[in-house]
Regions:
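Extended amphipathic alpha-helical segments with heptad-repeat/coiled-coil character used for oligomerization
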Residues: 6-36
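Repeat-mediated protein-protein interaction surfaces in helical alpha-solenoids
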Residues: 18-24, 40-63
Length: 202
């Protein structure tokens, strides 16, 4: 038997690639210093687990937990949550990982999510929410993620100004016959996606 890269050196199509990988055989230092392989090794969790045993988020969270410097894992995890419109978990993710090596700044869609979330609960009538079945402690817990909190966690003044513009325009558009069309200039935002795009069950 032989190590895979050595065996693959005999392949006409893969010989060059296999030869380039020979340097990593039985050489932990070389693996760890390589940008791709080193990052992949850091992604390995402390315990064995089946990939996709439950859902992709479980795998992504394990990777992010093991290696907070993995920018791709951070992006995939946040993208998954945003596409699912799971704002509670976006906020929780930012609360836990903002400031980590791969999350020194927040992507614009994540900032847009925090802005909407903070504003939504800040303006919520607690008594009305409780009367419709939402526990008061849940409302108050979400209201703790106020404007000061989201600014401290990466929301910029520029995006705050954009959100104010969005709210003003949406207030007018909501009175029109076709609010979706009236808000077309915000089509590329999380706000538009949240309000006007339905998630398919298929």
């Amino acid at each position: 038997t032989c190590a895979l890269p050595i065996c693959m050196e005999k392949s006409p199509l893969l010989s060059k690639w296999a030869s380039s990988q020979r340097a990593f055989l039985w050489n932990d230092k070389a693996v760890e210093s390589d940008s791709l392989l080193g990052n992949g090794r850091k992604d390995l969790g402390c315990e064995d687990a089946f990939v996709l045993y439950t859902n992709p988020m479980d795998d992504l969270f394990r990777i992010v937990e093991a290696n907070p410097s993995d920018g791709k894992a951070m992006e995939y995890a946040l993208s998954y949550l945003l596409l699912a419109k799971d704002m509670d978990n976006v906020v929780g993710f930012v609360e836990k990982y903002f400031g980590a090596p791969a999350l020194k700044t927040l992507p614009t869609p994540v900032q847009e999510c925090l802005l909407f979330y903070s504003d939504y609960y800040a303006t919520m009538d607690v008594k009305f929410a409780v009367s419709h079945g939402m526990p008061q402690e849940d409302v108050e817990r979400r209201q703790a993620y106020d404007l000061d909190w989201i600014i401290a966690h990466g929301v910029t003044e520029e995006n705050l100004a954009r959100f104010k513009s969005f709210k003003e325009k949406y207030g007018k558009a909501a009175q029109s016959r076709n609010p979706k069309s009236a808000m077309a200039s915000f089509r590329e935002t999380f706000w538009y996606y949240l309000l006007f795009t339905q998630i398919s069950d298929n």
